[in-house]
Amino acid sequence: MSIHRRRSLGVLTSSLTLFLMVLVATPSWAAEKTRLRVDDYQIEAELTPHLHQISVRAKVKFTALQDLTVAVFELHNDLRVTKVLDEKNQPLSAERVTQDSTVRVPLPAGLSKDATTTLTFEYEGQLDSADNSPVPGLKLAYIGDDTSFLFYAGRWFPVSGFGLNRFTSTISVTVPAHMLVIGSGKMSASEAAASKKPNASVLPTKTFTFVSTKPSFPGTIVAGIFQEYKSDEAGMDLHVFFKPTHQPLAPAYTTTAVQEFTYYITLYGLPPSQKLNVVELPGDTLPYAWAPEIAGLAGPSITEKTNYRLLADAIAHQWWGVSVSPASKDDWWLSDGFSRYSEAMYVESAAGAAGLEEAVKDMSVGALAYDTVPLSSASKLDIFSTEFQSLATDKGAMILHMLRWVLGEDKYNKTMREFATEFAGKSASMDDFKTIAEKNYGDQLTWFFSQWLDSTGAPEFKLKYTTYRLGGSAAKEPASKEERTPGFRVTGEISQDLDLFRMPVNLRIDTDGKTENKRIEVVGTTSPFSIETFGRPRRISIDPDHHVLTNSSDVKLRSAILRGQALQQQGDLSAALTEFNKALDLNKNSSLAHYRVAEIFFLQRNYQSSANAYREAINGDGEPRWTEVWSRIQLGKIFDITGQRERAVNEYRQATQTNDNTFGALEEARKYLQKAYERPKEKQ
């Protein structure tokens, strides 16, 4: 299982964002109610990497949830079913439906509700591209010489109830003897004779067997040539599998993984297993992947500066996804949102309040970018759509962030730990979580969950206030602290447009003396307040620590940019440009919006307009900082394309003078100082 984040050099955006952009135009998984529950898999797979081939024999034990006449499973469209047997080894017919990547097996005798049976599937195929992926455009299953990966989401074995149906498994994978295989569960390995199958390798092979006895979501397999780095620090059984080029970075990632793993133990208790495999994935698949005992990171994200945020999210899924899983699609945020906010909490522990603030800003943008469907109705959307991922991941995380503010630190931590413990190894619903939260809060929280789960939108706060000097003079020094009396009173009101809104909000009053904080209960469109201070008020701010999801002008701007990037990745450049211009309507000086506009014009080969927009980015508000160095580089490319080498060199030099190496900018600039940029030739 996998889903979500960080930087991608090509578009200079977060990997989660990139992932969400790619996952579009997908079929509606689970649109048809699941009628069976898979209990166990017995899978034997043989990989022939040099031919990109896989052959599989899979025994699927399942239970009917209602009377069945046809058993339906999802299976990758590049896999051809050659045989299906019932539990008496009698052959059955199978219908392949490519539109929804399913295989339908009629059951001649039927299967009554609660009855259990086993089907055996034999199938084979070539997995060498994303052309027929269950998620169009995204490679989720691939067989190759350097690295092979078979994600659970790739449906490389017959799947039912994706992400909801917990199961046990025994998976044996045969590969060339020089390869390692990483999977979930207790592992054993044995040498095997060369395969006698046509086209199979005559070289020695090795079979790796993984036994998972705890129902969860095993089924993700990674095979390839890796350097292994081991650690038993803090009682962990940690294995880091990196490619030789990244092996020098393994110790740093090992240390970080141990820190994150142990941090989560202090928050949530023990995970299902103390074993963790951190695995390098190819750069043309997910930014990261997770499965029981597995945290996979795409090669480009493994940098000298440890990508601790991405790793933290992947590791958090050992609790939220592997241990506690969603009971329905509407509850998906209990996995992805919980992991996202766990990452944010680790960032806070490692980088302080400033780190958390940046994470919250990112989550706020994602939470409101596609806020057209309530999170409690997310099942109306496709699991792999941009909208679904935005809601489940970022809005789900923001709900936890706000709940932490409502409950207070101790009660919040108690709620999360109890939820993780009570539902360990089980599926859970939002109501299950709400029950535990209300118990610790000491009152009902219907108003909170109804507001953020069952509704859309967020407030935009406005503040009006008047300051009065009181009778006591603040200028005079009192004889003692006890004699001090307030010198000023601030009265005013907080307003916003949501009639049913209710949330506690912090008011911060900066004065000549001590800063005052006042927790105000904002209810309805207008909420009055009165606060007395000792020093003269100089500045009043609403929710300065970003405890509440708000639709501020900055969030609106960044949300428009996020939507534009998604459209750009889909190839709809005109619609993307419209979104970027919406961002500029909110802030004409936004360097990021100008940069994105410039990218569109560059892709359209409208080089003059692109150059103009890159210069606007350089002269804008400078947020984020990397827009300057990359605008310089892009201007250099434009001058190279148009035959103005001297001007191009000048831009590359100015790029190096920024000393900003975000996303490897300095290496990029130095490369084109040595050799002029050439526009890639179009594919025929």
Please name every model-derived segment.
Residues 81-85, 182, 445-446, 459-542:
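Beta-strand-rich binding/interaction modules
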Residues 66, 272, 382, 389-486, ...:
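Amphipathic alpha-helical substructures
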Residues 142-143, 171, 209, 226-332, ...:
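Juxtacatalytic substrate-recognition/specificity segment
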Residues 24-55, 63, 82, 139-143, ...:
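N-terminal, polar/Ser/Thr-rich
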Residues 213, 287, 330-332, 336-402, ...:
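Acidic/His/Gly-enriched intrinsically disordered linker/tail segments
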Residues 78-139, 195-203, 207, 524-536:
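A surface-exposed beta-strand-loop module
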Residues 122-226:
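Extended, low-hydrophobicity, Ser/Thr/Pro/Gly-biased non-transmembrane segments
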